[in-house]
Amino acid sequence: MMNSIFGKRKTPAELLRENKRMLDKSIREIERERQGLQTQEKKLINEIKKTAKQGQMGAVKVMAKDLIRTRHQIEKFYKLKSQLQGVSLRIQTLKSTQAMGEAMKGVTKAMGQMNRQMNLPSLQKIMQEFERQNEKMEMVSEVMGDAIDDALEGDEEEEETEDLVSQVLDEIGIDINQELVNAPSGAVAVPAAKNKVVQAEATGAEDSGGIDSDLQARLDNLRKM
C-alpha cells in the first residue's frame, strides 16, 4: 500500500547508479564550460596584443584583468572536475564492493546447500568401493600383461628352438651323410637327436602348463574379489 502511494523504494545499487549518472553529467558540463573559457582566453590574448600595438594601454589593463579572472575560473573548473571525478570513482568502488558482497553471499549460500546435501558415510563408502575396483582393475591389467608377455615369450622361444633344431639337424645330416659313406653304423645318431628334440618339447609343454596354471590361479583370485 505504501509503495503504491509513495512509489517503490529504490535499492542502494539503484541510488548509487543514479548518483553516478548525475556526477558524470556534471563533469561533462564543467568540461564544456572550461573549454569555452579557454577559447575566450585565447581571444583575450589576441585582443590584448592588438590593442597594445595600437597604444591603448588603458584598454589593455582592463582586458588583462579580465584575462586573469578567466584563468582563475579555468583553474577552479579543473579542481572541481577533479573532485567530482574522485567522488564518481568512490561510487564506482562502492558498486563494485556491493557486487562482490552479493556474489560472496550467493557463493556462501550455495556452499552451505552443498555441504548439507553431502552424506559423508555415503561418500566414504563410494571412495572405498572406488579403491577396491581400482585395485581390481590394476590386478586384471597386470595379469593380462603377464599373460601377453608369456604368450609372446613362448612364441619367441618356440621359434628360436625350431631354428636351433633345424640348424642342429642340418649339421647332423651332414655328418650322417659323411658317415654313411665311411661307416653305415653312424646313422644311429639321428634317432638320438630326435629323442633329444622330443624331450625338449615335452619339457617346454610342462613349463607352459605351469604358466597356464599360475595364470588361472590369479584369475580365480580376481573373481573372488
Swiss-Prot record:
Changing V143F: In strain: cv. Mal. The lineage of its organism: Eukaryota, Viridiplantae, Streptophyta, Embryophyta, Tracheophyta. Changing V198I: In strain: cv. Dul. The keyword Protein transport applies. Residues 13-54 form a coiled coil. Keywords: Coiled coil, Endosome, Protein transport, Transport. Changing A193T: In strain: cv. Edi-0, cv. Lip-0, cv. Sie and cv. Bur-0. Component of the ESCRT-III complex, which is required for multivesicular bodies (MVBs) formation and sorting of endosomal cargo proteins into MVBs. The ESCRT-III complex is probably involved in the concentration of MVB cargo. PANTHER family: CHARGED MULTIVESICULAR BODY PROTEIN. Its main location: other. Component of the endosomal sorting required for transport complex III (ESCRT-III), composed at least of VPS2, VPS20, VPS24 and VPS32. Interacts with SKD1. One of its GO terms (biological process) is protein transport. Changing G186S: In strain: cv. Ct-1. It comes from the Eukaryota. Pfam families: Snf7. One of its GO terms (cellular component) is mitochondrion. Belongs to the SNF7 family. The keyword Iron does not apply. This is Vacuolar protein sorting-associated protein 2 homolog 1. It is found in: Endosome.
